[in-house]
Amino acid sequence: MSALEWYAHKSLGDGIFWIQERFYESGNRANIWLVRGSEQDVVIDTGLGLRSLPEYLYSSGLLQDCGSKEDAGRRPLLAVATHVHFDHSGGLYQFDQVAVHRAEAEALARGDNFETVTWLSDSEVVRAPSPGWRARQFRVQAVQPTLILQDGDVINLGDRQLTVMHMPGHSRGSICLHDKDRKVLFSGDVVYDGSLIDWLPYSRISDYVGTCERLIELVDRGLVEKVLPGHFNTFGAERLFRLASNYISKAGICHKVSTFAMRSLASLALRVTNPRTSP
């Protein structure tokens, strides 16, 4: 299967494109965002990486190919992972320039499929990307980041800037990217319009509460009007406020106890399926 078949996209205007993996039918299917700038383009999350995402970007005309991969005339392209979970980081190995938060840089560099929570089944991939492909073969490949991100860093695209916000809770290195001028928030799995996951091995409820308080502050200060999340559909500031507030309100003792049990089961399952890379 070609990259042009595997991916599909639509334009949201203002140089932003929403890309998805057509034949990965799962709640884990991540949104891939392309943000075009005057001096640099940025891909936010890369999906599973079962077909070449860079090939799709150029073959579909989303980006202009000025020649060979080494051609200095090509505008720089940076792949940013909002976190290293497999559904977001699987395609990072296809890019020359890769950025991730420092808290998860080591896990990515060693291909730690325990921390990437790799969990994929044949039933979720409704058309095999290549003959004989099986989900049990899938692993997130080790990638050495070329850019280590911290809270407050700014990624300069020329005519727009994306500010890094370290937002742990879902994972220890989760980030949002905030376009302050346009009041757009690329939220990864920090927040999306669904049940927020805080029961994975490196999730932490106390961190998530602090993150949600930051999200509420963004809304209160009028700094976000549109959220482009890691899963499902986009939404606005009012929904962002409600999602963050609801999480804080439920994060009591009962939730912590049930989450502890779920985290224990998830960790056990991941250690069985990813024995070589679990700590």
UniProtKB/Swiss-Prot annotation:
UniProt PTM: Palmitoylated on Cys-254 by ZDHHC20.
Pfam family, any one: Lactamase_B
GO molecular function terms noted in the UniProt entry: beta-lactamase activity; long-chain fatty acyl-CoA hydrolase activity; metal ion binding
Keywords: Acetylation, Cell membrane, Endoplasmic reticulum, Fatty acid metabolism, Hydrolase, Lipid metabolism, Lipoprotein, Membrane, Metal-binding, Palmitate, Zinc
Keyword Transcription regulation set for record: no
Localization, UniProt: Endoplasmic reticulum membrane; Cell membrane
Keyword Zinc: yes
Residue numbers of N-acetylserine PTMs: 2
First-tier enzyme category under EC: hydrolase
InterPro entries: Metallo-B-lactamas (IPR001279), NDM-1-like (IPR050855), RibonucZ/Hydroxyglut_hydro (IPR036866)
Binding sites annotated in the UniProt record for Zn(2+) 2: 87-88, 189, 231
GO CC, one annotated term: endoplasmic reticulum membrane
Family per similarity comment: Belongs to the metallo-beta-lactamase superfamily. Glyoxalase II family.
PANTHER family: ACYL-COENZYME A THIOESTERASE MBLAC2 (PTHR42951:SF4), METALLO-BETA-LACTAMASE DOMAIN-CONTAINING (PTHR42951)
Protein name per the record: Acyl-coenzyme A thioesterase MBLAC2
Gene behind the chain: Mblac2
